[in-house]
Structure formats: structure tokens, C-alpha cells
Amino acid sequence: MSEQFDASRPIYAQLVERLKAKILAGTYPPGGHLDSVRDLAAAAGVNPNTMQRALAQLEAEGLVRTERTDGRFVT
């Protein structure tokens, strides 16, 4: 199911907020493995490049870490 987005703000920024809220709420627990970029993008109804940008921002903020062969994990 696609999410609804506010057209006045960048979609990637809204994704960052939503993913951050899920991390802080425990939906994605520390050490938990995140779904693939494609799966997360499909669930949100966005382009994978947009989701990649959101995940890169979360990584820059220290909330997510990327393991080259294993994917992304919540820190």
C-alpha cells in the first residue's frame, strides 16, 4: 500500500521522518535488519532512488548502518 506524501516537501525527507519514527518506536529494533531498498520503496510507493536517498540520510545521522553484503541494520 502506497503512503501519502505532502507535495510541498521533498519525499525523501518525509521518508526519513517516517523511518526515524518507526526506529524510535521500536518497529525496527536496534540490530534489526531492514528490508531491501526495493521492498521498502515498493511498500511506500516511491522510486527506489528516493528510498536510497532517505536511507543514506539515516545512515549519515547514525540511525542505520550498511554492511556491504548483508544489507542495512538499525544501530
Annotate each predicted stretch with a short phrase:
Residues S36, D70-T75:
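Minor-groove-contacting beta-hairpin "wing" of winged helix-turn-helix DNA-binding domains
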Residues M1-L34, D39-A43:
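Extreme N-terminal segment that seeds HTH/winged-HTH DNA-binding domains in transcriptional regulators
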Residues H33-T66:
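N-terminal helix-turn-helix
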